[in-house]
């Protein structure tokens, strides 16, 4: 089970309002089950982002707590990055793949690890502000350039972290009278000083923001303000169809691909977005790429070619996408949106559309929709990136887009509707292909009109009317809705409240958001401190209060999940805690703690202003503009937060916060706001111990009764908690130092006690207790740091009589969250106050503990104290073990309800000979475990020589080495006899077993299909499962294609030949070449299986290359339809085996190199990436990992030849005996004979679409490429 990354991130989620934050990961995020644009927070760092509090009880550890455990995440197994030491986000084959319907996009806003106590990822100072000085500061803040009639949006997500509790927080200064305060709060917030806005004569609006991360690259996004919400009854899905046809039909976009540019597109309720990520200049000629990128976007949006052949290709692609998207998560999302927005089209206009309509449209129908909506005044262009000459960019925009639409429409003067309102949009004359202004002979339909109808964007987006959940609304309570399905595993209920968006444009607006943030941040602690039994009634309780630009409203949601048999108690507990918070409010201690945390975290965020990626900034601005919030940069966000913080009072916080919760706390009262909807999603059957599967029944009346009974339960005020200032006192530290005499000792093989490499800035040390330490000073993330402990062993060290012991043990440690004499709550608050986020993870080959911290207020020292206490005085609790075991029992039982997980699980069992260490532990294995066995399984790994700590951050040499000696050096040395556990042999199953091909059939109301194809590979360092060292035979390896290799060899002369020789002798040879090979195979799979044959919508090739285990494997994942999936599997096998007959072309290798090198360059500014590079640098079980693997990485990629790629390819076992495949089919007739399409029915081409995040984010179409 790959990285069993569990994410029980109990946290607060808010809509971003201040400024985006980027932690170095600007890749499009994976599937977010929660809908809406929300950002996870830790109350530890209450940040003004989506007001969401999430409390997940199994781990009873707040999101800010030190050990928030995350149940198995499906990441980290099949997709380990080939670059040394870096683990790419991936999925565990045993757990299946998260086929996110909407997730290829990043979330707008904050992207950062949240302060939290131990998150189990196994799978896987500002003094009080003076109001007057704040006013002076405000008047000096520079404002941005404003475009005509352009609403200013607000925005940055507030940091997640919480600072040391201060009881001396002096709130409203007495010298400020109410009139002055009112005047101050009415002042407008400052606009982003570098954000340039403008509008062309034809109405096209544009925004330009210089941003240096990543360097020499920029983002260009064309947002057309039309989406599924604008479709008529017979047009459902047509906006998405146009996205496909326009984007993939653009020749100018295709030409950009050779420059290193990446592009994609997606459709949502309220808009369609085409985006290009491009270098600023071409690599060789240094030609400016801005004009070419703008020209491509112009062709895509305003000059598409609606060729019949392209329309038919995309019709087939979308129909395939529709079936692939139809997971149970998508269906749940549909249910939530249908009931939340039952009064308008948001509840029934899902972007993917309706199958029966998609099949019917002709080219003319599609073109007419484009003509109606695709015009300059209905679009906004965003350009964010490494820009040094804004006037030149403006000139390029005018030159490329300026003539569009001028010949056939009046220029809109304002965004308000015309005389015909929204209907005017449907009366616009037909413009051929939407190319107004570029054609001459095709104006016959419009030339004789005396007056053109003005085309304008809607004044309100999305153009729908809502029934608001406001007190006094004369609407009857809608009965709870129940969605039952056999593929659901747990009970989940959502109570929704829907109100208008409150624009954040003044200091008073920001103050209200801050007060709500403080109030809602308390909820997770309320629940976590009260429910500590081994079988708590709920799995998670989550309160979300967030703005949604895509839905045009603010939604507050209480979500309760639980095991079905516990659902009534879970609902009672949740509403009881909400009522307690509403009735008694937050305490003085909570107010000071959360306020301090917000100020400290926003200060840290402001210091990171130069490290936010362009795509994060752009997404944030786009969402903020949709909500009409004022956009500020991080520095402005911090200054304004400081300004309003000093005016906040406890009474106002509780008054403002209570209003948010009234729809729950006052439920049933005549004056209470009515919930917009109550929706329960439940399984049809549940597992009952000793009985098996039995029917699960629930009624609307029972739900109402459970809510009311929870509200009637007696409640008491929240007690104050004592928060430790430190986990180890100075006197204790002195005593330990005297006892253990920590010091640095010579590093094995060097004779030196300190190795420092000037080129990389990496320093290596070894402590007298055996712990190896690597650190790198980095200023790219100001005053921030990250630390990781890696302990060799992991699940591979589990024995046949302790299956699951390591993974359950790590989860147990996370669930308990205690160290020394401190309670879990004290440890959590310690982490909150010091802005520490800690996570635990167990993979197949190691256990890891990671800490993110700031260097403010001794944050690094606090993180080291926590690590010391975990190593020296961790506490193992029986009830924590019970919760951990129950979690994995539930997780195992849910496998048959997931097509992807069930298919992947069966494949892994077949390929690895039933080895349970690579899949979820079975109920039988789990029942045989006890607290002592899991504790021993985990702690036996913690032997000095088996532990390596790496740290990257903005610290000084003196600071870091003092912490290393004080807190790591004083960890008790291992006994001489102590050795980390060995591992039982890992074997691939022999072909004689006849399990090379298998199938899984899943009964479902809807049809879907997926497949996995896998086989053996070496590990990253050239070792194989058979014990071979490939470096010993690299010179004897068979060559792939004599003709090719011979001609290429002739090109290698002198230095080139020496370079190739050096590459083949380098320890990272197979890591580098396998990475390039994966890129090439991925490209071929998409081109052949998806685009040419049209057999799939989504296909990928991934390599899992271990570092410590002598094996690896490759996996091809493909989704399809039951009628095509068998041919899709055959096509994937043909591509995989076809590299000899269809030899690799130089352009394929060049593109693979460019992709990986660009990714490497972009990631180098991230502390987390450097931490990955440092992994295993001193590990005795990874002897080939050395500094050259980091220093020479770029030159290794550049030196790789086609012959080298074939040397790597020949190590993949792709013959029929070694290759394993498993096909999963879901449908009403699953298990019966599936009709396979004939050759004539096979489509010629296919492609994929996109998805943003948010409630119903699975509605958004997938990326187009």
From Swiss-Prot:
Residues 1-143 form a transit peptide. It is found in: Plastid, Chloroplast stroma. GO terms for biological process: embryo development ending in seed dormancy; proteolysis. Its cofactor is Zn(2+). GO terms for molecular function: metal ion binding; metallopeptidase activity; mRNA binding. InterPro entries: Metalloenz_LuxS/M16 (IPR011249), Pept_M16_N (IPR011765), Peptidase_M16 (IPR050626), Peptidase_M16_C (IPR007863). Signal peptide: none annotated. Its EC number is 3.4.24.-. It comes from the Eukaryota. The active site is at residues 243, 314. Keywords: Chloroplast, Hydrolase, Metal-binding, Metalloprotease, Plastid, Protease, Transit peptide, Zinc. The keyword Transit peptide applies. Zn(2+) binds at residues 240, 244, 321. SUPFAM superfamilies: LuxS/MPP-like metallohydrolase. It is an enzyme of class 3 (hydrolase). Coiled coil: none annotated. GO terms for cellular component: chloroplast; chloroplast stroma; mitochondrion; plastid. Cleaves presequences (transit peptides) from chloroplastic protein precursors. Initially recognizes a precursor by binding to the C-terminus of its transit peptide and then removes the transit peptide in a single endoproteolytic step. In a next step, pursues the cleavage of transit peptide to a subfragment form. RNAi plants were almost all seedling lethals. Surviving plants exhibited slower shoot and root growth, and grossly aberrant leaf morphology. They also displayed defects in chloroplast protein import. Belongs to the peptidase M16 family. This is Stromal processing peptidase, chloroplastic.
